[in-house]
Amino acid sequence: MKIDYYEALGVTRTADDKTLKAAFRKLAMQYHPDRNPDDPEAERKFKEIGEAYETLKDPQKRAAYDRFGHAAFENGGMGGGFGNGFGGAGGFADIFEDIFGEMMGGGRRRSNGGRERGADLRYNMEVTLEEAYAGKTAQIRVPTSITCDECSGSGAKPGSQPTTCTMCSGSGRVRAAQGFFSVERTCPGCNGRGQIIKDPCEKCHGQGRVTQERSLSVNIPAGIEDGTRIRLAGEGEAGLRGGPAGDLYIFLSVKPHEFFQRDGADLYCKVPISMTTAALGGQFEVSTLDGTQTRVKVPEGTQNGKQFRLKGKGMPVLRQSVTGDLYIQIDIETPQNLSKRQRELLEEFEKLSWQENSPKSAGLFSRMKEFFEGIGE
């Protein structure tokens, strides 16, 4: 039984060219033999959708099919010029190259002489918070592949030249029959390079590149954060046989700081002060990342955990003229190892100031006392 071409592609009879192509592309990828090896049903479906699309994409064939159905192509219909077979070097393979380009192997692609882009490289670098604040220029040494200076990247021994592969005629691909259609594969004679090096360079063994450690200068901008990535174009691994170099990616991490914690552009720190300074008031100095000393006033009666904000004393925002703030949290130290006299004074202070100077704690203990006395009754 003949298939309905529209049903095979899952489209209506009014589908335009764009819809036909999209439907064919989706189904071709689904049933492609490379994705369904040894699956006769997938191969059958693959053949059907190819036959359907080959007919419907051509306006004249489609018009004939819409009018006469499959009879339009039987017994030499339409002058015998519109057969729906897929033999020869064109036909089915050409349809796929039109739709997918190089996905099917790029039969129309020509060899680039085996040149391949070099691999991208990664380099991990750790910087201090001070360096992240101010920025810096760092010198790094990266082990990588560079172009061989003996053969200038060709891979061939000086005085000789690579020869064109006779198996693929320099295309790097060969066409192989697979059932009712032909597909393209990487040429086994040259591994897809299109050229064969008979006399390889002794220094690079035909690769066109050698391994060597390089020294590079890296500019680290102010305001970088943990995980910031810097790309150095063309500083990666050298390309194969004269191909373009890859890129080098610097991945930055910021060391934990002894005093400051970071949250975006803002910095946080804790400053210990004495109990008397918190009660009577005073001041202290804090060193900031810009190298200055900033004096902070502590008002009398400052409570533990009180936070002070120093505007513009945080981290710069990467590539912006904006700076975060520094938040200082007060950490009141409780005195230890008191002398007899100190203890006496504190006990006297407690008796004099319990109600007047500590209303929160006095009120809490008063309510607790009343609560438990009520339970006892």
From Swiss-Prot:
Induction: By heat shock. InterPro entries: DnaJ (IPR012724), DnaJ_C (IPR002939), DnaJ_domain (IPR001623), DnaJ_domain_CS (IPR018253), HSP40/DnaJ_pept-bd (IPR008971), HSP_DnaJ_Cys-rich_dom (IPR001305), HSP_DnaJ_Cys-rich_dom_sf (IPR036410), J_dom_sf (IPR036869). GO terms for biological process: chaperone cofactor-dependent protein refolding; DNA replication; protein refolding; response to heat. Its cofactor is Zn(2+). A zinc finger (CR-type) spans 135-213. Zn(2+) 2 binds at C165, C168, C187, C190. PROSITE patterns: DNAJ_1, DNAJ_2, ZF_CR. Gene3D superfamilies: DnaJ domain (1.10.287.110), Heat shock protein DnaJ, cysteine-rich domain (2.10.230.10), Urease metallochaperone UreE, N-terminal domain (2.60.260.20). Zn(2+) 1 binds at C148, C151, C201, C204. CXXCXGXG motif repeats lie at residues 148-155, 165-172, 187-194, 201-208. GO terms for cellular component: cytoplasm. SUPFAM superfamilies: Chaperone J-domain, DnaJ/Hsp40 cysteine-rich domain, HSP40/DnaJ peptide-binding domain. Keywords: Chaperone, Cytoplasm, DNA replication, Metal-binding, Repeat, Stress response, Zinc, Zinc-finger. It is found in: Cytoplasm. Residues 4-69 form the J domain. GO terms for molecular function: ATP binding; heat shock protein binding; unfolded protein binding; zinc ion binding. Binds 2 Zn(2+) ions per monomer. Its main location: cytoplasm. The J domain is necessary and sufficient to stimulate DnaK ATPase activity. Zinc center 1 plays an important role in the autonomous, DnaK-independent chaperone activity of DnaJ. Zinc center 2 is essential for interaction with DnaK and for DnaJ activity. Participates actively in the response to hyperosmotic and heat shock by preventing the aggregation of stress-denatured proteins and by disaggregating proteins, also in an autonomous, DnaK-independent fashion. Unfolded proteins bind initially to DnaJ; upon interaction with the DnaJ-bound protein, DnaK hydrolyzes its bound ATP, resulting in the formation of a stable complex. GrpE releases ADP from DnaK; ATP binding to DnaK triggers the release of the substrate protein, thus completing the reaction cycle. Homodimer. Belongs to the DnaJ family. This is Chaperone protein DnaJ. It comes from Brucella ovis (strain ATCC 25840 / 63/290 / NCTC 10512).
